[in-house]
């Protein structure tokens, strides 16, 4: 897995395109509560339990999610 590079978000709000890039890269990251322009990006553990979630428009959403991606994210192979 040394050739796999994590996909991260900008530290602030993020776009749907950025969220889709992350959900494509990680098996345990999903888009939920989709309201069109606003949605939550959710990280779940291997058992399906919620680890963290943020609305895409929150001022520090990406920063919070990136820390959980680093520790909880499961990259697709």
From Swiss-Prot:
Gene3D superfamilies: ykff protein like domains. Transmembrane segments: none annotated. Pfam families: DUF905. SUPFAM superfamilies: YcfA/nrd intein domain. Disulfide bonds: none annotated. It comes from the Bacteria. Belongs to the UPF0401 family. This is UPF0401 protein UTI89_C4989. It comes from Escherichia coli (strain UTI89 / UPEC). The lineage of its organism: Bacteria, Pseudomonadati, Pseudomonadota, Gammaproteobacteria, Enterobacterales.
């Amino acid at each position: 897995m040394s050739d796999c590079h994590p996909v991260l978000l900008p530290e602030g709000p993020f776009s749907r395109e950025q969220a889709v890039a992350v959900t494509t890269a990680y098996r345990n990251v999903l888009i939920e509560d989709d309201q069109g322009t606003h949605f939550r990006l959710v990280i779940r553990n291997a058992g399906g339990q919620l680890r963290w979630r943020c609305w895409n428009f929150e001022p520090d959403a990406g920063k919070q999610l990136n820390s959980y991606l680093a520790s909880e994210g499961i990259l697709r192979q």
